[in-house]
Amino acid sequence: METATLVTIFISGSLVSFTGYALYTAFGQPSQQLRDPFEEHGD
């Protein structure tokens, strides 16, 4: 394969992995440990 093809595949895979990890952190099991500043603020 050409170098440009390998670089493109690597960058695309990195972006997909980062997006998946971000979604897992936001909506998956670790999201229960995140603090919600809107719930902490009393009206």
Swiss-Prot record:
GO biological process annotation, one example: photosynthesis
Keyword Chloroplast (UniProt): yes
InterPro entries according to UniProt: PSII_PsbN (IPR003398)
Subcellular localization: Plastid, Chloroplast thylakoid membrane
Residues passing through the membrane, by range: 5-27
Recorded topology in the membrane: Single-pass membrane protein
Coarse class of the protein's main subcellular location: plastid
Gene Ontology cellular component list: chloroplast thylakoid membrane
Keywords: Chloroplast, Membrane, Plastid, Thylakoid, Transmembrane, Transmembrane helix
HAMAP family: PSII_PsbN
Cited function: May play a role in photosystem I and II biogenesis.
PANTHER family, alphabetized: PROTEIN PSBN (PTHR35326:SF3)
UniProt record similarity statement: Belongs to the PsbN family.
Name used for this protein in its record: Protein PsbN
